[in-house]
Design a protein with these regions (language model features):
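Active-site loop/lid in soluble adenylation, ligation, and acyl-transfer enzymes
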Residues: 1-129
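Coil-to-beta-strand transition motifs
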Residues: 19, 92-94, 177-180, 192-193
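Phosphate-binding core of ATP-grasp and ATP-grasp-like enzymes
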Residues: 123-135, 166-179, 203-204
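C-terminal helix-cap and adjacent tail motif
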Residues: 109, 200-226
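A long amphipathic alpha-helix within ATP-dependent nucleotide-binding catalytic cores
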Residues: 149-181
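Short histidine-centered catalytic/ligand-binding loop motif
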Residues: 37-52, 134-161
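Conserved metal-phosphate-binding beta-hairpin within the catalytic cores
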Residues: 99, 180-200
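A short glycine-rich, hydrophobically flanked beta-strand micro-motif that places a catalytic Asp/Glu
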Residues: 72-81, 174-189
């Protein structure tokens, strides 16, 4: 296998069969030794975090595939903390797709003059460029089309997939007595332009509350698999 990309929390290898292998690491983003999923640099190492991230990703990707929603997931190997995935091209230089069920975080910082903290949102979808230097700026549907990053049809497909996937995750959290406030995803497309969910679904990609209190990502992982 050939190492093709070294990421903050995962390394990517090209396999002989044309697929790719994601190696989940115990490195997490943060600052000054404090875990913060919103940071853009590795801040510390937490033993076992790669394993729990892979297990949650495996759980949800299988559930999403079973619902008829396409992902790049092939199989996971918990012994070496890896996941085999189908090849996929990212949109532009990478996009993050956020689905919001309540007004918190950056949404509240932007629009706090118009909405109350924690107000319900109707599975509101927004997209941002993955650009650390520019603070991951928001981009509209029209902007993505004008820039040639995706078609209107692809945007609508992603928005629909995002709402469906978010409901799957939200329902699962609700069954465990927790509430999903928001979650972020990444998407790619195959040689035929067909959209698929890529990367991971792990505790660091979502904001979950219990009895009105925010649950830290590592605690969420423990509660989820309890």
């Amino acid at each position: 296998m050939k190492l093709v990309y070294t990421g903050k929390t995962k390394n990517v290898f090209e396999m002989e069969n044309g697929n790719y292998l994601l190696k989940f690491k115990d490195d997490v983003t943060g600052k000054d030794g404090v875990f913060d999923p919103g940071m853009n640099e590795v801040g510390l190492t937490i033993e076992g975090v790669g394993d729990v991230n892979l297990r949650m990703t495996d759980y949800f990707f299988k559930k999403i595939n079973a619902a008829g929603i396409r992902t790049h997931f092939v199989q996971a190997n918990f012994d070496d903390t890896t996941m085999e995935v189908l090849p996929a091209k990212v949109f532009g230089k990478g996009l993050e797709v956020i689905c919001r069920r309540r007004a918190v975080g950056s949404f509240l910082r932007r629009y706090g003059d118009y909405i109350e903290d924690g107000a319900e949102l109707p599975y509101y979808v927004e997209m941002t460029f993955k650009d650390d230097a520019k603070g991951d700026p928001l981009v509209t549907r029209e902007g993505l089309i004008v820039l040639g990053i995706m078609t209107g049809e692809q945007y609508d497909t992603i928005a629909d997939m995002t709402r469906r996937i978010t409901k799957i995750v939200a329902d699962d959290m609700a069954d465990k007595g927790m509430e999903l406030y928001d979650i972020k995803f990444e998407y790619g497309y195959d040689a035929n332009g067909e959209v698929m969910l890529i990367d991971e679904i792990a505790s660091g990609n979502m904001r979950v509350y219990k009895d009105g209190e925010y649950i830290q990502p590592m605690e969420l992982s423990e509660l989820f698999f309890k």
